[in-house]
Amino acid sequence: MNNIRNFAIIAHIDHGKSTLADRLIEECNGLETREMTNQVLDSMDIERERGITIKAQTVRLNYTANNGNKYCLNLMDTPGHVDFSYEVSRSLAACEGSLLVVDSSQGVEAQTLANVYKAIDNNHEIIVVLNKVDLPAADPERIKLQIEEVIGIDATESILISAKTGLGIKDVLEAIVTKLPAPQGDTNAPLQAILVDSWYDPYLGVVILVRVKNGVLKKGMRIVMMSNNATYQVDNIGIFTPKKVMTGELSAGEVGFITASMKEVADCKVGDTITEEKRPCSKALPGFKEVHPVVFCSIFPNNTDDFKYLREALEKLHLNDASFTFDAETSNALGYGFRCGFLGMLHLEVIQERLEREFDLDLTATAPSVIYKVETQNGKVLNIHNPSDMPDPTKIEIVEEPWITATIMVPDQYLGEILSLCEERRGEQQDLSYVGNTTTALLKYKLPLSEVVFDFYDRLKSISKGYASLDWEISDYQESQIDKLSFLVNGEPVDALACIVHKSRAEKRGREICARLKDLIPRQQYKIAIQAAVGGKIIARETINPYRKDVTAKLYGGDVTRRMKLLEKQKKGKKRLHSVGNINIPQNAFIEALKIND
């Protein structure tokens, strides 16, 4: 056990951690040269294309150090994006040390901070690695100072590397072996293992990634999940090198995978403790919590025949990702679809993109919303995330909405605009400080989640030319003035356009969407009224004027009454059309109408 090292790589998005993982695998001959691809551990196409890691991955490397000893290194590659922060915290709980990778031209960013603090909470030994030192803009000395001032860890012995060219990779491996502690654990104690991740394999069923803390996990053993007391028999045990290699057992300190004839990923909660049925351990490992979706939106197939394929696709994605939820729902305007819950906007985009690409579905998604707590006058508390479930305004006592604490790091030349963006989004400033003696400001803000889920991140990036970084966590619920904004086209409510907004925004948002619909809905032979309403009160209206056919064109001279008769007939016809005519709102009108204007 003294020769095992378990470590995670933590970094902000794009600071090069997946590339560093590639180099470490190469250096330890984990894969043959012909099998090496860029970002080996990012197995999904979207992960490679967007250059982000979504699922936590693991690999075991065998390394012979300069002192001649053979070491077994378990590397956990963690996601860097804020939506997947729970995956990061679980991966960190399974390790004793971390490599903190910082881009030596960009320096420390908000998510680096958040993840480092998680590592420190897990009592990790941290090795600082400065990447991209081959770039002309690299300034390692400045970044070392910044790390010491912002994070408060010693960066004098930072390792300078370039993951792209392979410079300094050997030094990283030596540092892992010499500076990081070996895992603690007792192989004779009852089995105690933490469930780090799980995914669905078409041949093996559910595969669980585990880190054994105490005891030994053997093939054929009956195990118990401590969160729900479900029992299973272990069928296979193995490790990733990154290829699967069956080993038959895992003992204290080791990281590997097991399969146990589980049908669904939802059965194995990430962060749960696994123990033996015959000889269970006395208590579960700390840090387990259920992950709940934060952002909701409805997804409808553009072709109604695709409904069953959409259900199958969602079930397949759910096999791999239990943090995302879905329930069937119907809409008068869009037909049958699903109400889905996600961890954040990136999570939503990734799932939607996977549905469209991997399953070839053509989809419409409604405006994302968050969970509001509504207390009715008879004392009931409802959790509402779908505008159509919102009770009548006369029956509502109070509405509470979720607030978050956001940490934003931004160069000071963009500070003014970022502050006004936060104020515009109903933010409350908590703290503003400067990072050491640099020109980077560290902002702490409390913001309503509903103002952040839409396009806050994109606006933040565009205002700051990409230099600002954001990390957030949900803090609490606060009472708020919330209204349901409904839209009527020709007096008929269109449920797919309804949204829940803050009272101060209702009129502006209503006018915007009505104006947009006016441009998007095709003209008809009769007049169309588009209205926005809150409660029973109309707050905005636009009118689409009708086409007018010139029915008098063929008249030449003659009596004026003939002309009047034809015009009268046209008027009657339009009236009849107006009462029976059904307006087909094109699909793209929904999507375009719900986009928020800057």
UniProtKB/Swiss-Prot annotation:
EC number: 3.6.5.n1
Gene Ontology terms, MF aspect: GTP binding; GTPase activity; guanosine tetraphosphate binding; ribosome binding; translation elongation factor activity
Alphabetic keyword roster: Cell membrane, GTP-binding, Hydrolase, Membrane, Nucleotide-binding, Protein biosynthesis
Major localisation: membrane
Membrane disposition: Peripheral membrane protein
Pfam families linked to this entry: EFG_C, EFG_III, GTP_EFTU, GTP_EFTU_D2, LepA_C
Compartments, record wording: Cell membrane
Binding residues annotated for GTP, in chain numbering: 14-19, 131-134
GO process terms (BP): positive regulation of translation
Enzymatic reactions: GTP + H2O = GDP + phosphate + H(+)
Domain tr-type G positions: 2-184
HAMAP family, alphabetized: LepA
Family of this protein: Belongs to the TRAFAC class translation factor GTPase superfamily. Classic translation factor GTPase family. LepA subfamily.
Main function: Required for accurate and efficient protein synthesis under certain stress conditions. May act as a fidelity factor of the translation reaction, by catalyzing a one-codon backward translocation of tRNAs on improperly translocated ribosomes. Back-translocation proceeds from a post-translocation (POST) complex to a pre-translocation (PRE) complex, thus giving elongation factor G a second chance to translocate the tRNAs correctly. Binds to ribosomes in a GTP-dependent manner.
Identification of the protein by name: Elongation factor 4
Naturally occurring in which organism (per UniProt): Wolbachia pipientis subsp. Culex pipiens (strain wPip)
